[in-house]
Amino acid sequence: MRLDPHASVVEFYDALAPWYHLVYPDWEASIAWQGDALAALLAAVWGDGVRRLRDVTMGVGTQALGLAARGYQVIGSDLSPSSVRRAGAEATRRGLTLRGHVADVRALAARPGSADAVLACDNALPHLLSEDEIQVALAECLRCLRPGGGCVVSLRDYGPAPAPGTEEIKDYGHRVWEGRACRLRQIWRWRGPIYDVAFELVATGDSAEIILRTPSTTYFAVPVARVAALMEAVGFKRVRRVDGCLFQPVLVGTR
C-alpha cells in the first residue's frame, strides 16, 4: 500500500506541539489521571501481566507519560515529528523512559506480537478519512499484539453530521500563553461526514487578536459503533465500549 503522508495532520500537530498542553486546563493533572485511569482499565480487562505498551498515536505524550510514570514499558509513535520530540523532552524532564519515533499508524515499525497492549487515544483514528483506512490501522494494532493482548481506542462520540457548510466554534476557555491572557478555541467546518479543524489562541480584551493559529486538519465523523465493528472485522474478540474511563468513549478488544 502506498502511504499518504497526511500532510495536513503533520502540519497541524507540528504547529500545535509547543502549546498542545493548553488543550487541557491542567495538563499535568490530566497526564496523572489518564495514567491512573488507563492503568486501572488495563488491569481490569487484561490482568496484571500487561507491561509492554505501544502508544501508536502518542502525540506529545499525554497518555504515554502517565503510563511510563507507573512503570509500564512504553514505546510511542506518531506522524508528527515535533510531537514525538516534545514527548521525548517531557519524558527526559520527568526522569522517565519513553522510546518514541515517527510512524504511520497504518504501517507500524513493530515486530508481530511484541506488545501486551496497544493504545490509540484522543480521537486519533478519525484522522483516517475512510473506514477502509481505519481498518488497515486496526489490523496493524492487532499484528503488534501478543495472543491475549489488548487494544484501547478512545473516540469522540459523534452524532449526525450537520449540513455541509456549517461552522462550529468549540470554546476551551481561558488560558495563559507567554504571560498573555487568552482563550483557546477550535473552529470546525463541516463538509458532509468530513470536517476541517483548526485551533486558535485569541487574546482576551478588545483586540481579540489571534495570537496563534494552527493549519487546518481533517477528521472523519465515524460513529463509535462503526469502529467497534471494524475492530471485530480485523479479528479482535470481546470488543466492547467502556464509558466513564476517559473523557471520551473507549473501545477495548482482545487479540
What does each model-found stretch correspond to?
Residues 1-59:
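Conserved class I S-adenosyl-L-methionine
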Residues 60-72:
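Conserved SAM-binding loop of SAM-dependent methyltransferases across substrates and taxa
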Residues 80-82:
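Conserved SAM/SAH-binding beta-strand->alpha-helix loop
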Residues 93-107:
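Conserved SAM-binding strand-loop segment of SAM-dependent methyltransferases
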Residues 110-117:
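A short acidic, Gly/Pro-enriched loop at the edge of an enzyme's catalytic core
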Residues 135-147:
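A short glycine-rich, Lys/Arg-flanked "PGG" loop and its adjoining helix->strand segment in the class I
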Residues 152-222:
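SAM-dependent methyltransferase
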